[in-house]
Amino acid sequence: MDSVSTAILLLLLALICLLLTLSSRDKGKLPPGPRPLPLLGNLLLLRSQDMLTSLTKLSKEYGSMYTVHLGPRRVVVLSGYQAVKEALVDQGEEFSGRRDFPAFFNFTKGNGIAFSNGDRWKVLRRFSIQILRNFGMGKRSIEERILEEGSFLLAELRKTEGEPFDPTFVLSRSVSNIICSVLFGSRFDYDDERLLTIIRHINDNFQIMSSPWGELYDIFPSLLDWVPGPHQRIFQNFKCLRDLIAHSVHDHQASLDPRSPRDFIDCFLTKMAEENEDPLSHFHMDTLLMTTHNLLFGGTETVGTTLRYAFLALMKYPKVQARVQEEIDLVVGRARLPALKDRAAMPYTDAVIHEVQRFADIIPMSLPHRVTRDTAFRGFLIPKGTDIITLLNTVHYDPSQFLTPQEFNPEHFLDANQSFKKSPAFMPFSAGRRLCLGESLARMELFLYLTAILQSFSLQPLGAPKDIDLTPLSSGLGNLPRPFQLCLRPR
């Protein structure tokens, strides 16, 4: 790019930023926050390497609700259980909008289920929840699919023969296969190139979007579209996944029997045919591709990441691991695999899984929200369309809700009688209207996978347990555990 083109680009960017800044002052009474600079906003106060820590630090100065400017974009930040709960639960309708998250929106254009709004989002969410809840229609249940995949995973883990290995890839393949089974109707062999492609592109995108490059792209997408860097791979990866999904949809169309749907794609295609004559229908081919992509992305990365954190925590605290195994032996034994019916009789195991999710805090800022109308909230007036960041890390680490929030402590989810105790501040799947629709599936996977693995193996670190580092490698879109290896000792 020559100097004239560069100058024109910078001038256009400056004008856009100025217009956005001026338009953000039109109405409303926003909470106080640091004074923004022209164009840059408050970026000089924020560490691009760790936006989460910077925003959390500002909440200690400005309180549980403050305004910050990410470049020209005005954002209201909510921290702590009470503020987040009042917004997402008590005033859930007003805070149910989804911001145009650039890394996704520039690909989906607001289509699909994760980043759509209004009637389209409500219709797609209701349809998807119904399909996931009633999946199978007389055929195999989701639990059966998880148990089947768990058996393949255990067989793969036995091949390690006690030698050190990195669990990332094997867990990703297995977890991804479950959502693939729901979406596409069947699992893939672990060496199937389609499965490997899905995992490769999703993992790469999750890491990029959790990096400084991803955070900068979120703030200045128009500028960074012209800048070389790893963020450019995001859309290449998305396109490859879209092409893979489109190929599967084409195969489904050729063999579709509306009376006997095999999977999510079949159900969606049938709905498309039913509403083909309705000009207001939200069921179109592009919507199918984007919704399938959203579910595939959401169902692959977060569960695998949580399981890796669980491995680290159980190796760092071997007494916790031993107590979980003792409960498994008592309730389930060794003659069969654990089942969902066992969970109610295993309060300590349930508490450990919840504590892993709280402590790991995989999606610490949730996905970005937006108010759907002018909203009176805590004495302020938030104008329609204002972006909202909910710091879920401050919910999961709120000392008013958890006795020792900075420590890994399963007792947070146990009462005085050692029975499982729910916490209203447990929000790894967010809360309110935008609660993750895959919550039930993810909870099933975490319980069935972790108990099956600990029934068969003990997790052994390569070094001293006290030296295991549980601090995340990235704190952007997601908290990622540091790379590690472990050994599995058959029990």
Swiss-Prot record:
InterPro entries: Cyt_P450, Cyt_P450_CS, Cyt_P450_CYP2_fam, Cyt_P450_E_grp-I, Cyt_P450_sf, Cytochrome_P450_fam2. Its EC number is 1.14.14.1. One of its GO terms (biological process) is epoxygenase P450 pathway. It is found in: Endoplasmic reticulum membrane; Microsome membrane. The keyword Membrane applies. PROSITE patterns: CYTOCHROME_P450. GO terms for molecular function: arachidonate epoxygenase activity; heme binding; iron ion binding; oxidoreductase activity, acting on paired donors, with incorporation or reduction of molecular oxygen, reduced flavin or flavoprotein as one donor, and incorporation of one atom of oxygen; oxygen binding. It is a peripheral membrane protein. Its cofactor is heme. Keywords: Endoplasmic reticulum, Heme, Iron, Membrane, Metal-binding, Microsome, Monooxygenase, Oxidoreductase. It catalyses: an organic molecule + reduced [NADPH--hemoprotein reductase] + O2 = an alcohol + oxidized [NADPH--hemoprotein reductase] + H2O + H(+). Heme binds at C436. Its main location: endoplasmic reticulum. One of its GO terms (cellular component) is intracellular membrane-bounded organelle. It holds the Pfam family p450. Belongs to the cytochrome P450 family. Cytochromes P450 are a group of heme-thiolate monooxygenases. In liver microsomes, this enzyme is involved in an NADPH-dependent electron transport pathway. It oxidizes a variety of structurally unrelated compounds, including steroids, fatty acids, and xenobiotics. This is Cytochrome P450 2F5. It comes from Gorilla gorilla gorilla (Western lowland gorilla). The lineage of its organism: Eukaryota, Metazoa, Chordata, Craniata, Vertebrata.
